[in-house]
């Protein structure tokens, strides 16, 4: 098997209505830290935390990001309880907040401090 399916990546589960700017900033934040992302359209939708938890469960790196239609983002680790994400942005998130969410996910993967 070849292609991105073999490459470990932080999975980004996005609701079909996710604003493009949110997705762009989140992925840029992770990639700035040297961690690749793989974007998956989540057909069932859901809130950012539920999407992030599902992404973390499916990721070979045990880390996932969820993006909902409102523009909220959540970062999750596969070993955390579903409603206990590692980080979230609110509905009033800014591009800096979304990029920080991507960096946070990458830093969890690398085992670095989040601050």
Labelled PLM ranges:
Residues 28-36, 57-60, 103-115:
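Generic secondary-structure signature for well-ordered alpha-helical cores
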């Amino acid at each position: 098997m070849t292609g991105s399916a073999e490459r470990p990546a932080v999975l980004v589960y996005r609701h079909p209505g996710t604003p493009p700017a949110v997705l762009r900033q989140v992925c840029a934040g992770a990639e700035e830290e040297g961690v690749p992302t793989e974007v998956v359209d989540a057909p069932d939708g859901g809130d950012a935390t539920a999407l992030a938890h599902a992404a973390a469960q499916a990721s070979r790196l045990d880390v996932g990001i969820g993006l909902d239609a409102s523009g909220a983002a959540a970062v999750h680790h596969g070993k955390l309880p579903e409603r206990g994400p590692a980080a979230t942005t609110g509905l009033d998130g800014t591009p800096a907040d979304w990029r920080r969410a991507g960096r946070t996910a990458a830093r969890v993967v690398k085992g670095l401090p989040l601050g």
